Amino acid sequence: FFLFLDDYYICFLIRKRYKFMIYTNYYNSPIGRITMASEGTALIGLWFEGQKYFADSIKEECTEKDLDIFDDTSRWLDIYFRGKEPDFTPKILITGTPFRKSVAEIMLTIPYGKTMTYGEIANVIAKEKGIAKMSAQAVGGAVGHNSISIIIPCHRVVGTNGSLTGYAGGLDKKIQLLKLEKTDKI
């Protein structure tokens, strides 16, 4: 299951639409504080403090709570920030448009320490749909609204010729994540 949120009012909209409570907790990473969000059993959000689109909107509509999913996610992040590839993935819940789900599923296949371009993702989707071409810009929009940063590795998506383009958590964090993974794109 995967979840993508299209609005700044994440918790309010989720609670109103899906009728479940949203819980949050925090992880202090070496490159900044991270907000974790869950509906109780699965991770639905992972954002750097101040990240575009998500983190500023969840404070009032969510309840801070300790949950097993936050323990699992923190363990995953501990391994990741030690410069190692975690050998498990916390349970994640992704919903959204079929297009955003497709982009998320492709991002999940990008190996640790490797990158993929927006155009390459667009080509994979075009091939899956049996069409000649898919817009790399549309892929960029979906990547930019990824609500589960790091675990769904949107930081591994780069521009044409490997150029480092925007990252909702900040380009400085994208660079730090790619350096941590010893990616050759930096």
Residue ranges of predicted features:
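…primarily DNA-binding HTH/wHTH and HhH modules…
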Residues: 160-186
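Extreme N-terminal basic, low-complexity initiation segments
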Residues: 1-9
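Regulatory, non-catalytic segments
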Residues: 130-148
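The DNA-recognition helices of helix-turn-helix-type DNA-binding domains
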Residues: 125-128, 146, 171
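Basic nucleic-acid-binding alpha-helical/helix-turn surface characteristic of O6-alkylguanine DNA
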Residues: 9-10, 15-130, 134, 180-186
